[in-house]
Amino acid sequence: KDTGSEVFAMGYPMADVMGSEVKFTDGKISSKSGIGGDVRVYQISVPIQPGNSGGPLFDMGGNVVGITSSGLNRDYFKSENVNYAIKASYLKNLMEACPEEIILEERVETQVSSATLTDRIKQYEGYVVLILTK
């Protein structure tokens, strides 16, 4: 994806406080690299919180283009909406390197142009799950 592309995330930020309903946030790809020029990640303006990490980052066509991962420390860097997502292409390589076989279905990018964004969110929220750990 290119810098300036519109993207959105879905997840369960701070589920213990904000509840267990899936949340939607949107923004843009601010840069095609992260801290120190790390090309494995996108810098995104999508607001993410603890609990969004590991959730999907979608393009406006409904394709998963990344997985939300982190943000700059707001107190230390005095920054807002400087967050990161691991690019989907690097996740595919990681999954293929796993010792257990993971079958990945190749697919062509889709365009869900006829569905409204609210309809797409309703469709995708069934695939975004909350995982709790002890």
Set out the residue ranges of the language-model regions.
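Sec-exported extracytoplasmic/periplasmic mature domains
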Residues: 12, 34, 63, 96-100
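Solvent-exposed, acidic/flexible segments
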Residues: 1, 22, 50-51, 84, ...
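N-terminal activation segment of mature serine protease catalytic domains
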Residues: 97, 101-134
